Design a protein with these regions (language model features):
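Catalytic cores of glycan-processing enzymes that make or break glycosidic bonds
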Residues: 1-249
Length: 249
């Protein structure tokens, strides 16, 4: 169950039609609050659920959705506001949030109210039904990037989209240019994505530039820069390209 959490009292459960809660096998008692309960995360897949009447099953489904997707919104929001305001006030640094993927609405509400910068990534757009985000629509209070440590590099996802498994330096330059022109306050791009604009500097195999694949336990944080800092500094053509792209507004 969630922790911290806002468990249900026996009276609340009774209002949903559930009594003798401990005998049902569909709830777990809160370890810190006796007489208060949490619905099982996978309750609908249990034999106990199958033994319920049709109306009780519908009630449990509604309760399950309410508990996991609605009940905690304000609870988490108030806790986050209380803690994050103190943390933000303790430093002069900009505060940025990693808000990619599925989010509870309270996360976005809290970040907006505290002016915490969001993270914007084209391959993980925040708009429903959109396959690829448009950097031109990013909010000012955001950090724009082309990839992260836990996702494919820009070369990789561009290659997946064009069907070749890789992207040319020209395609990479164009994508970076689009991101650098975004309204975001900051643009912070991984080194691999910058190197991808130069065919002589980037690695031959795009897949070897990925930092981490969360779905593969044998692939973790093993990327190492394949050229020295001195070699990169000496690459005048590359540095001119970076300078030109970084000046985009």
């Amino acid at each position: 169950h969630f922790s911290p959490a806002y468990p249900l009292s026996e009276e609340e459960l009774a209002s949903w039609g559930f009594s003798n809660v401990e005998e049902l096998g569909l709830f777990v008692e809160d370890p810190y609050s006796k007489g208060k309960y949490h619905p099982l995360i996978g309750g609908e897949q249990t034999l106990a659920f199958n033994h319920l009447s049709h109306s009780a099953q519908e009630s449990y489904r509604h309760l399950h959705h309410y508990y996991f997707y609605q009940r905690h919104n304000d609870f988490w929001y108030s806790n986050a506001m209380k803690k994050l305001q103190q943390l933000i006030a303790s430093t002069n640094m900009l505060t940025c949030g990693e808000d990619l993927g599925m989010l509870n609405e309270s996360v976005t509400r809290c970040m907006n109210n505290l002016k915490i910068l969001s993270l914007e990534l084209q391959i993980m757009p925040k708009e429903l039904g959109v396959g690829l985000g448009n950097p031109a629509t990013y909010p000012y209070l955001s950090v724009c990037t082309t990839s992260t440590h836990d996702c494919p590099t820009m070369r990789m996802w561009l290659g997946e989209r064009n069907g070749t498994g890789d992207a040319t330096p020209q395609e990479c330059s164009a994508t970076i240019a689009t991101n650098m022109a975004a309204p975001s306050m900051l643009a912070i791009l991984p080194l691999q994505d910058w190197l991808s604009i130069d065919g002589s500097l980037r690695k031959g195999d795009a897949a070897t530039e990925r930092i981490n694949d969360p779905g593969n336990p044998n692939h973790y944080w093993r990327y190492r820069m394949h050229i020295t800092i001195e070699e990169m500094i000496a690459a005048s053509g590359f540095n001119e390209k970076v300078k030109e792209l970084a000046s985009r507004q």
